[in-house]
């Protein structure tokens, strides 16, 4: 928001390492603002100040998944905070995805979804509070997100058009618990405190590529 242009450059250093550099363009050339290894990254205004923050997903020195949030201070991009995320970077690099949108409270958020062993989706919900990145769904006891269910090729999205992103939570159908061809999906929204609420339920015929929005009261009565 300062009228200057920045460029993010990512490149593969080796088979197992990618690097990311942020440059600002000036009259006499470019100047490096930040350098990090990464698996995925996202750029978004997370605190409504008109400036977009940079979030970098990478593995720390122990191999644990980490999210680094870079903030603008006096024209310089600086590391503001780092937090744990649920997934390993090996998992995130495959079918993982970052979705940028808002919570029920209109708070900007990053939904980081990992697919473990191609069978289970785990989603972290990251927000910026007082300049500190926060994972709303990370359990202090287990160290992983409580938002986890069977993966059926669905990712967080605004499923009902209310302007809020919902997280898909797979619920096995009675009599067909092992099948992935058809699923009931509960779509979960969050507020800025991390409080979850079900927005709606859908029936998804995954292999056929269609879904049905379930009327209120139908969800518990659907069988395979």
Feature locations, PLM:
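Beta-propeller-forming repeat regions
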Residues: 1-224
């Amino acid at each position: 928001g300062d009228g200057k242009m920045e460029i993010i450059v990512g490149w593969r250093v080796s088979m197992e390492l990618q690097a990311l550099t942020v440059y600002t363009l000036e009259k006499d050339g470019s100047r490096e603002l930040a350098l990090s290894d990464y698996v995925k990254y996202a750029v978004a205004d997370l605190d409504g100040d008109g400036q977009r923050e940079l979030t970098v997903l990478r593995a720390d020195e122990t191999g644990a998944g980490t999210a680094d949030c870079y903030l603008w201070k006096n024209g310089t991009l600086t590391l503001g905070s780092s937090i744990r995320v649920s997934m390993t970077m090996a998992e995130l690099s495959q079918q993982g995805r970052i979705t940028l949108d808002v919570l029920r409270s209109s708070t900007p958020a990053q939904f980081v979804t990992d697919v473990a062993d191609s069978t289970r989706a785990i989603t972290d919900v990251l927000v910026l509070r007082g300049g500190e990145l926060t994972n709303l769904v990370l359990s202090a006891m287990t160290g992983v997100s409580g938002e986890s269910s069977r993966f059926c090729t669905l990712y967080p999205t605004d499923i009902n058009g209310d302007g809020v992103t919902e997280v898909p939570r797979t619920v096995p159908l009675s009599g067909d618990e092992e099948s992935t061809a058809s699923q009931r999906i509960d779509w979960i929204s969050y507020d800025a405190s991390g409080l979850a609420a079900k927005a709606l339920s859908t029936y998804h015929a995954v292999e056929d590529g269609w879904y049905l929005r379930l009327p209120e009261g139908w969800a518990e009565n659907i069988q395979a």
